[in-house]
Amino acid sequence: MGKCQVISHPLIQHKLSILRRQTTSTKDFRELVNEIAMLMGYEVSRDLPLEDVDIQTPVSKTVQKQLAGKKLAIVPILRAGIGMVDGLLSLVPAAKVGHIGMYRNEETLEPVEYLVKLPEDINQRQIFLVDPMLATGGSAILAVDSLKKRGAANIKFVCLVAAPEGVKKLQEAHPDIDIFTAALDDHLNEHGYIVPGLGDAGDRLFGTK
């Protein structure tokens, strides 16, 4: 079974508290999502493999470390996942970026996929699948399904806020997936929103209703 890790770094928790506030502006919300994603990236990438490399400093030759193994791909679930991409790219600027488009049917609460655009070598890459919210788990499960259909095998799901119901569903559907979140909240309400949550991340990121 994949793990669910809550990243409780003080800076992340401080910024998340501001992010949750109803009075936080669109501009500040967007910046905070970017900053939290970047800070989470350090923990999410902790187990990336390293290899020895010979280099010449201004003083002498030395053997140091550099990233090795599979290349990275960052795949946001549209539209809200877009807000997390730049923060992660600031750490791994050579990563490719794919897109999986989803919207939620407000009557059934089920996700509907409308776009899949991925690097051609997605099956050779370690993937950070990103979405600010893990609520019902439906979108995350469908996105992982899409990635696995295209040969992807090394996938981490990264979100800012998760509900226990969504974590349980994702782990049951894909027990090989590790989940990284900044907060594990209380529950989902009758509308499928995380409580206390932070509202609709997409609307708050882009200033829409």
Curated annotation (Swiss-Prot):
Catalytic reaction list: UMP + diphosphate = 5-phospho-alpha-D-ribose 1-diphosphate + uracil
Source organism superkingdom: Bacteria
Cleavable signal peptide: none
Enzyme type, top EC level: transferase
Keyword terms, alphabetized: Allosteric enzyme, Glycosyltransferase, GTP-binding, Magnesium, Nucleotide-binding, Transferase
EC number: 2.4.2.9
Molecular function (Gene Ontology), one example: GTP binding
Entry annotated with the keyword tRNA processing: no
Pathway as given in its UniProt record: Pyrimidine metabolism; UMP biosynthesis via salvage pathway; UMP from uracil: step 1/1
UniProt keyword Lyase present: no
Residues that coordinate or bind 5-phospho-alpha-D-ribose 1-diphosphate: R79, R104, D131, P132, M133, L134, A135, T136, G137, G138, S139, D200
Manner of cofactor binding, per the entry note: Binds 1 Mg(2+) ion per subunit. The magnesium is bound as Mg-PRPP.
SUPFAM superfamilies (UniProt xref): PRTase-like
Any Pfam family: UPRTase
InterPro entries hit by this protein: PRibTrfase_dom (IPR000836), PRTase-like (IPR029057), Upp_B (IPR034332), UPRTase/APRTase (IPR050054), Ura_phspho_trans (IPR005765)
CC cofactor: Mg(2+)
Activity-regulation annotation: Allosterically activated by GTP.
UniProt-annotated binding residues for uracil: I194, G199, D200, A201
Biological processes annotated in GO: UMP salvage; uracil salvage
Family, as annotated: Belongs to the UPRTase family.
Job description of the protein: Catalyzes the conversion of uracil and 5-phospho-alpha-D-ribose 1-diphosphate (PRPP) to UMP and diphosphate.
Protein name: Uracil phosphoribosyltransferase
Species for this entry: Streptococcus pyogenes serotype M1
Lineage: Bacteria, Bacillati, Bacillota, Bacilli, Lactobacillales
